[in-house]
């Protein structure tokens, strides 16, 4: 599939070449092949080259946005002249801690002697495909530079896999790095290559993350209105539960202007520890102590779950309807005045 040759089960292949003859040697064997085997390229190199008609620059830039550099003192000091006190370059290891595939590193396994045993999968959409995706799915953004790192992480992991993607996977479906089930349309494949660290597929249509079609959709496709709740959902690791495809949830979603600092009631306040590394926690104003309390992660998780009904309202003829939530409580839907509330008062917020 990746080498564009017809498979014959009676032959042995190596990187697209057919092995014809085995010659015994003192310390192993020598194999003759029917053609020269060129060194495999990494996923990074494949995307950097692109094709004559297509470029993967936008996707590659998003991957680079999610990289981390770690200073490698051993490699730096091993350079010629370093021991003599000469000035040498500082060398760094590049990693992608939030992605399931490392497009740069060619030693992908836990044991650094292994390479292809721990192959990953990369499915890169072309620039044109991503521009179309931006205009149709994320129209409130002018470019991918405006997306938060978390949204980029979801997008990129949706185009990666922990395991190689083979032709059988394309036919039957597979799970991507965002834990979504994916069925690729073979008609959307414009390039395929077997790389040194992953299988590579170029696409003329981007894969839409399932979260963009779930009740969490407003958190990701709108801009500047639900940033607090999106950060809270990610902070509490609730995303996988809220994007279940076989559920029928009702998400009663407060916007930033209703709960945050400023015009909001201060019932959900984000406190940034390190904006560059996206490290933060949450507080809420306590009316009793007249001070801010820091949310424990589990407490905030329960609070969010109590905004999500296990089913949408049904009895529109009734004045009030009680909906059970994922957090175990009930939401009261008042059809007379169009409001939604909990079943008890809260000490948080001043609104």
Regions found by a protein language model. Name each.
Residues 1-351:
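Mature, structured domains of secreted/extracytosolic soluble proteins
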């Amino acid at each position: 599939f990746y080498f564009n040759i017809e498979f014959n089960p009676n032959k042995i292949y190596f990187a697209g070449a057919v092995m014809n003859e085995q010659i015994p040697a003192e310390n192993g064997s020598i194999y003759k092949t029917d053609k020269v085997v060129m060194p495999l390229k990494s996923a990074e190199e494949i995307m950097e080259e692109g094709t004559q008609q297509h470029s993967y620059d936008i996707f590659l830039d998003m991957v680079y946005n999610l990289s981390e550099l770690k200073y490698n003192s051993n490699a730096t000091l091993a350079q010629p002249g370093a021991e003599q006190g000469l000035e040498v370059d500082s060398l760094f290891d590049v990693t992608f801690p939030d992605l399931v595939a490392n497009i740069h590193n060619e030693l992908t396994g836990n044991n650094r002697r292994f390479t292809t045993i721990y192959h990953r999968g990369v499915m890169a959409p072309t620039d044109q495909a991503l521009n179309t995706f931006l205009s149709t799915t994320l129209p409130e953004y002018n470019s991918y530079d405006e997306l938060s790192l978390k949204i980029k992480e979801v997008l990129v992991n949706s185009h990666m896999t922990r395991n190689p993607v083979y032709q059988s996977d394309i036919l039957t479906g597979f799970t991507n790095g965002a834990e979504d089930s994916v069925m690729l349309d073979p008609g959307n494949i414009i390039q395929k290559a077997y790389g040194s660290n992953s299988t590579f597929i170029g696409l003329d249509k981007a894969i839409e993350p399932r979260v963009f079609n779930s009740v969490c959709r407003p958190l990701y496709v709108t801009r500047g209105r639900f940033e607090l709740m999106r950060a809270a959902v990610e902070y509490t690791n609730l995303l996988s539960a809220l994007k279940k495809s076989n559920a029928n949830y009702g998400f009663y979603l407060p916007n930033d202007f209703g709960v945050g600092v400023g015009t909001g009631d201060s019932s959900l306040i984000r406190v940034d520890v390190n904006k560059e590394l996206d490290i933060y926690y949450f507080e809420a104003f306590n009316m009793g102590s007249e001070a801010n309390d820091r949310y424990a992660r589990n407490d905030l998780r329960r609070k969010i779950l109590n905004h999500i009904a296990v089913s949408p309202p049904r009895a529109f003829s009734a004045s009030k309807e009680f909906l059970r939530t994922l957090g175990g409580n009930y939401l009261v839907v008042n059809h007379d005045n169009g409001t939604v509330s909990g079943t008890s008062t809260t000490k948080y917020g001043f609104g």
